[in-house]
Amino acid sequence: MAASTKPTTKLSTEEDDVSRRDSESSADFMKSNEELQATMIPEDDGANPATGQPTWTILSDTEIKSVLVVASFAAAISPFSTSTYYPVVTAIARDLGVSVSKINLTMSSYQIFQGVAPTITAAFADTYGRRPMFLVCFVTYFVANVGLALQNDFTTLLVLRCLQSTGSSGTFALAQAVTADITTRAERGRYLIYATLGSTLGPFIGPVIGGLLVKFLGWRSVFWFLLCMGTVFALLIFIFFGETARPIVGDGSIPPQSWNRSYLQMRSKGVSNLKPNLASLERRKSRPNPLTSLALLWDRENFILSVSGGLLYAGYSSVTSVLASQLQQRYKYDAVQVGLCYLPVGFGSLLAYRTTVRLMDWNFEREAKKQGLVIVKNRQTDISRFDLEKARLGFVFPMILVCSGLLVAYGWQMHYHAPLAPILVTMFLIAIILTGVMNAIAALLTDVNRENAAAVGAAMNLTRLLLGAGAVAVVGPLNKSAGIGWTATVTAGFSYNVNTKGIQTKRRAAAIFEVSRATLHRRCDGKRARRDCQPNSKKLIQQEEEVILKYILDLDTRGFLPTYAAERGMADKLLSTRGGSPVGRDWPRNFVKHKAKYSILDEDVYSFDEAGFMMGKITTQLAVTGSERRGRPKAIQPENREWVTLIQGINAAGWAISPFVVFAGQHHLSAWYEEDIPRDWAIAVSDNGWTTNEIGVEWLEHFIKYTDGKAVGVRRLLIFDGHESHHSLKSRELCKENNIYTLYMPPHSSHLLQPLDIGCFSPLKRAYSREIEALICHHINHITKLEFLPAFKAAFQRSFTSANICSSFRGAGLVPLQPDIVLSKLDVRLLTHIPAASPEAPWEAKTPSNRKKKQIQKRGTLTKGEGEDTLAQKEADQQIEREQRQGGEQSGRSRQALARSLEALEVGGVAHSLNGSFV
């Protein structure tokens, strides 16, 4: 993993110095990252390295509670419209002249639409936002209440109750979606009391208000009251409620569309200083799909959870729906007294948020601690490796058993006309337990379907209300035939058996969920999957390991050498914060071994450097010299000292990148691209044939283009010297964008550590010299770019072989890495050798090649293939132009010749004799 570290000019081998330096670096890093503690961390605005999760919302705790309270009161119109209707059933039946059973059908139809309508509302809310759909629901609700207050027949009552349900029920699913938008999984139970405050108060306040209204003002006043209440809640949404949908506003830092802002947001003239966090935006659905809720129910887990919650709600509905009629028949209570009897149900639901719902959060944190998961305030918990079902449903099944027993007790108490006090206490306990169970199931459904929070809320709403409507429709006739005691017993037994014993054997469960029996047995015994469990020797949790990785990369960025001592010191610091023992001696080595994805493979190690060629410098020519002179005499062509630069890269696996040649000049000439060189060779031009910062960037782009498809790992290492053109700002940005790590060699060490200098450039120049010797033998002693390219091609193919490249890296001690060899090479005194001057015999070159050269591009870089294509296009254009011009000239010359012939015939006096034949 340390392949990307940068060597320095002064290397210390003292272990004490290394340990002291690493300790200081780790202390600085810990000081600059206070959030590294693997405990409950206060909220802030940035991402937390202990969890790797960003801040979930910019809203403060008070703002979250305020938003949830407004949304919950808006959602209260649905249960409020249901419960206020209970005391007026008898009065409406009497005034309309129909039976109570028919009026009960309006309650069943209300619940059916209460389940179906949210599927449409949720689909539009996930696309266009929560706030617009709240307002649409309220407009529909207003129209229905006005009609209900003015109607006079049963059919109109039935239709308008369905419309009222359509407008009111959508708000319940929207409130659930708002809760998922601004609260995390670990904190959802704590905020549920605010998110469901309105919907909890509605069922037990509604009957009281309905009873008072029907007693003193008549049953029509109930619907006028609902209209007024809905107007107040709609004004709260219009004035105070801001958009929360994460596909639109993200974590709240992104402003919504102008038409989707609250009245306070539109009136506010201040400009927010918050920087929009675009990363918090979730994928937005292109169009609403009302069938999304049904598609979610098609999933087995969602279906089982929804049906379980629906059956519990059906049992609850069977209790509350017949309570009013039973109290009036058995205890002769009036509407007000019946309404007051619903108060224990409401108080029980409120108390549930201080008992059973808090128990849900406690169980979540307990399971997270067992599984090594860090819970951080205002940050979403990663559940990819977390047993979420056990955390949410660990306490549910015992509570279902207790709730079923209480339901049976309630039925037989009513059957034997027991005193009212134990009946109300039983209802109070049922409300406490049932609210906790229902919220646990709803939280689990929301957790596993976070991106479709509104749709999954509508799916659960659909299931429970359809089952509740069926229970309400059946419970009346069943009470008459079997009595309320047996009705409650059958309902409780059915709910308990389906929820706890629906799948009798593990063999059957394995067949249903398509898993092996052995796997299912291990899961039932509490054994986790191998990919989800940590070895016993693994002291650090995943988040702590990520902190160490960040620390190592930080050391590398600042130029320090990450060592095993540094890794061990950082790990011990993290463990000491939670009372853990230090890591073992071999832990750093094993840590690096297990984090292979952060290392750089040998196949992804590259080196590049420049080499210069002076085209006027050619090799041996025949000359008379002293017999004792050693070596091959050289001759320099005085008329041509043009410089050519080669920028070459090689890979440690034994292959070379296409050459990048820099010529002196202003334009790319067509003749260069007529030579027989590969199409992927690149040619650039500069004023003097040397490399520049711009050319360095162009070569880096050439390198990225050539090596992107050949990378084995996720990182590439590029080794080069410290020339200015190698580390310009643009070059560093390109390397960072493409995950390229750079390794600068110490000054004056490239001849010792650069693989190209060690084993490639020397053979290349010798091979090039032999090619020029061959040209001399053919009487070509003036070398231009046109002679250089084919000669260089032959020399390159002979010298850049796989064996030479591999031996170059091996000789430099880089691949395979041999630190001792590298350090021993650096421990030398660098001397500058000044060769003695030697006279050179002047000579006169022959006439150079006179091949026609055309300018095809100014500046920039062209590969051989691009040059050929440009040249071919220009030649085609010139040929077309030439043919058009020649055609015009030919026709002009023909007309002139004809005129001269006629003039000559007339002058000779023979025009009359030849006129006929001419014509």
UniProtKB/Swiss-Prot annotation:
Glycans are attached at N104, N260, N461, N915. Its main location: membrane. Disulfide bonds: none annotated. It is found in: Membrane. Residues 1-11 have a biased composition (Polar residues). Coiled coil: none annotated. Keywords: Glycoprotein, Membrane, Transmembrane, Transmembrane helix, Transport. The keyword Nucleotide-binding does not apply. GO terms for molecular function: nucleic acid binding; transmembrane transporter activity. InterPro entries: DDE_SF_endonuclease_dom (IPR004875), MFS (IPR011701), MFS_dom (IPR020846), MFS_trans_sf (IPR036259), RNaseH_sf (IPR036397). Residues 641-809 form the DDE-1 domain. It comes from the Eukaryota. PROSITE patterns: MFS. GO terms for cellular component: plasma membrane. The chain crosses the membrane at residues 69-89, 132-152, 192-212, 222-242, 303-323, 333-353, 393-413, 418-438, 465-485. The keyword ATP-binding does not apply. It is a multi-pass membrane protein. Belongs to the major facilitator superfamily. CAR1 family. This is MFS-type transporter clz9. It comes from Cochliobolus lunatus.
